[in-house]
């Protein structure tokens, strides 16, 4: 399942700065998070300890549950657990979140109400019953997840109707100038404004 692969890639990316972003030795110790930096209603299992070893263990559990979701093993339970761990991880350090993190959490939420393990999964292969579900499925969750993804494109198109995109073409330059979002390649491309 592609959603589980995205979760695994996200975990791998976050693991590169695990100590800096998720331990008490990093940029946001638990004491600072609890004292007002984060939302008081955000509860995170990652707040149980600020030790690096505990965070590594939580990342490993999150990864194992994501692998179970990818394989389609006990898909419903795996989806709920992956959503819980993803939201918990995001709540641990709200300073480093982007819109993609919110979208991932929402897609995982709606996936809890969809038959994610109905096809191409261990759950589907283990279904020994004579009754096989139809390939057609519609529910509120189906409409919601499609609407959620569709709105990303609609609002992106609306935002790109500004003259900065169509007349002077400087939007890409400005986007790559944001240090928090730009990668090494982005910083390199800033040396060639004619390409942008």
Language-model features, listed with the residues they occupy:
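Alpha-helical membrane-anchoring segments
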Residues: 1-196
């Amino acid at each position: 399942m592609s959603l589980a692969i995205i979760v695994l890639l996200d975990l791998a990316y976050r693991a590169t700065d695990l100590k800096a972003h998720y331990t008490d030795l990093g940029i946001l110790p638990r004491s600072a998070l609890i004292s007002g930096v984060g939302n008081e209603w955000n509860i995170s299992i990652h707040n149980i300890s600020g030790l690096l070893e505990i965070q590594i263990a939580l990342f490993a559990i999150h990864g194992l549950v994501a692998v179970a979701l990818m394989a389609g093993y006990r898909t419903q339970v795996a989806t709920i657990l992956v959503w819980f761990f993803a939201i918990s991880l995001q709540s641990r350090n709200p300073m480093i979140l982007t819109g993609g993190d919110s979208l991932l959490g929402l897609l995982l939420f709606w996936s809890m109400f969809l038959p994610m393990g109905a096809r191409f999964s261990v759950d589907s292969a283990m279904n020994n019953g004579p009754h096989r579900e139809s390939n057609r499925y519609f529910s509120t969750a189906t409409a919601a997840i499609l609407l959620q993804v569709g709105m990303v494109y609609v609002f992106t198109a609306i935002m790109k109707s500004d003259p900065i995109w169509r007349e002077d073409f400087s939007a890409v330059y400005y986007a790559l100038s944001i240090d928090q979002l730009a990668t090494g390649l982005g910083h390199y491309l800033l040396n060639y404004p004619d390409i942008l």
